[in-house]
Amino acid sequence: MYLTKEEELILAGEYGYALQKAMEILVALGDIYGADRLIPIKSAQVAGVSYKNIGDAGIEFLRDFVEAGAKVSVYTTLNPAGIGDDEFMEKQMEVLELYRKMGIEVTSTCTPYYGANLPKFGDHIAWSESSAVSFANSILGARTNREGGPSSLAAAIVGKTPNYGLHLDENRKATVIVDVKAKVKTFADYSVLGYHVGKTLGNDVPYFKNLKPEKTEFLKELGAAMGATGSIALYHVEGETPEYREAITDKLETITVEDSDLKAVRESFQDDWSDIDMILIGCPHASLPEVKEIAELLRMRGKPLKIPLFITASRAVKALADALGYTEIIERYNGKIIPDSCFVVSPIKGWYRGIATNSGKSAFYFRSFGFSVRLDDVENLIKEAP
């Protein structure tokens, strides 16, 4: 991989240990993936935030960078943090403080685009959360690979990333056409579709036909579910996403999605309400319109839920919900908005037995953790819940 004179000096340690170590990570990645050079990035989004995921070894890794004086050189935000007991939270707060000392904005969310970290079409970025990567690539038309925590941090420190993968035009072309014959209209429909397609395709770049999403949130959930059951980091939707016109250049294989395919997924996540003791919405983190809808549905229900309803959202969305009165309504009916956190990366085994959710991503992970899972649209969950 070609390096400029300045980049060579960084790699040689002339600009300090922190930049040298970050550059070593980027050069290793570039060599592995055959990148021709490093390219500047506009922003970064760093995973490896929950203490559940990184442990003490991760804290030592971050501490080494901080003690070497590492500072990020582009606007950088974090993935959600975990929540747990007092001992866990002490470690979790240490992780956040280490990131803060590197100049990272400690807003811990998988939807940074609902706040200040909103890239423009064509921007090169280095993001690591799978659903955020999918949203940035597919809906915003920005360009990022699905980075790991260390590589996104290294890119944030250096301000550059290796030029390979989805940064290149040729790798953003569709590799398979997905002809959707099934009826797909609601949030949960898109969630189930994403679950099925991710599991079926793995790491392709799908081009969807016959989808007419009413809300951007539907596409957010489609990408999140595909990123959970597969490794899909970019997709195109005919007539909807910004790069669909240039996405097909060759004759491609077509797969068809029928109602029966989605029915099979739904039926696999229909555990009885007697096994469910929590409703979880906000995977990826909920938007303000999603929070508003939940407040309205709870008000229509007219009586408090007997099991808790947790909504995970970014700090920015929570602040708006507070100001607009949605939070007060939600709390009146046994709900709570939890900012900057994620139950998937929290040690909650033993706290609850089963979850009800509208998220295919949540359904996938919590089933793998051994929880009972019920998957449906939030309207039905709030209406049917005890």
Swiss-Prot record:
One of its GO terms (molecular function) is lyase activity. Its EC number is 4.2.1.182. It catalyses: (R)-5-phosphomevalonate = (2E)-3-methyl-5-phosphooxypent-2-enoate + H2O. It comes from Thermococcus kodakarensis (strain ATCC BAA-918 / JCM 12380 / KOD1). Signal peptide: none annotated. The keyword Transmembrane helix does not apply. It is an enzyme of class 4 (lyase). GO terms for biological process: isoprenoid biosynthetic process. Keywords: 4Fe-4S, Iron, Iron-sulfur, Isoprene biosynthesis, Lyase, Metal-binding. [4Fe-4S] cluster binds at C110, C283, C342. CDD domains: AcnX (cd01355). Its cofactor is [4Fe-4S] cluster. This is Phosphomevalonate dehydratase large subunit. Heterodimer composed of a large subunit (PMDh-L) and a small subunit (PMDh-S). Belongs to the AcnX type II large subunit family. Pathway: Isoprenoid biosynthesis; isopentenyl diphosphate biosynthesis via mevalonate pathway. Component of a hydro-lyase that catalyzes the dehydration of mevalonate 5-phosphate (MVA5P) to form trans-anhydromevalonate 5-phosphate (tAHMP). Involved in the archaeal mevalonate (MVA) pathway, which provides fundamental precursors for isoprenoid biosynthesis, such as isopentenyl diphosphate (IPP) and dimethylallyl diphosphate (DMAPP). (R)-5-phosphomevalonate binds at G48, V49, S50, N53, R63, N79, P80, E129, S130, K361. InterPro entries: PMDh-L-like_dom (IPR007506). It comes from the Archaea. Binds 1 [4Fe-4S] cluster per subunit. The crystal structure contains a [3Fe-4S] cluster and corresponds to the inactive form. The active enzyme probably contains a [4Fe-4S] cluster under anaerobic conditions.
